[in-house]
């Protein structure tokens, strides 16, 4: 049986809207993905956390990523494909400057991955434009 080459990337993938939670923290804008579980497109209404709002918290990767990255490293991951929440970087979709808190989160995440020996593979999440940006199209 042939062995995988040393350079083969073992890993997994996540989607920001499915794992991050923290939908309304550190300046993140409301994305179309935040609205979809509620069956309507439009302005976000205040909500009570419940099973129907599970994506609001998801696995709370935004706050618990160090623990998750450590588990991925323990599992032997050498890469992790993540998506970047557009509404966390450009909350309204038309800003000239990015949201520094959003950039800082991804900086910390990438640093944690590097320390664990996990190569980041990133993509913008295609279903994550800000609600304001999506509504203007």
Question: Over which residues does each language-model region extend?
Answer:
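Mature N-terminal, pre-catalytic/accessory segment of carbohydrate-active enzymes
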Residues: 1-10, 15-16, 58
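Generic structural "secondary-structure junction" signal
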Residues: 6, 21, 25, 56, ...
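Charged catalytic carboxylate motif
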Residues: 11, 64, 105
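Short, solvent-exposed beta-strand-terminating loops
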Residues: 14-39
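Aromatic- and Gly/Pro-rich amphipathic surface segment
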Residues: 30-70
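Substrate-binding cleft and catalytic face of glycoside hydrolase catalytic domains
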Residues: 67-137
């Amino acid at each position: 049986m042939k062995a995988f080459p040393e350079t083969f990337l073992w890993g997994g993938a996540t989607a920001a809207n499915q794992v991050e939670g923290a939908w309304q923290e550190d300046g993140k804008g409301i994305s179309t993905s935040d609205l979809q579980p509620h069956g309507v497109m439009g302005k976000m209404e205040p909500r009570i956390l419940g099973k129907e709002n599970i994506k609001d918290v998801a696995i709370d990767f935004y706050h618990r990523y160090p623990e998750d990255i450590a588990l991925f490293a323990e599992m032997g991951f050498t890469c992790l494909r993540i998506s970047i929440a557009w509404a966390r970087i450009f909350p309204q979709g038309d800003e000239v400057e990015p949201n520094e808190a959003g950039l800082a989160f991804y900086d910390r995440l990438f640093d944690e991955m590097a320390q664990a020996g996990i190569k980041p593979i990133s993509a913008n999440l295609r279903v994550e434009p800000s609600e304001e940006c999506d509504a203007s199209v």
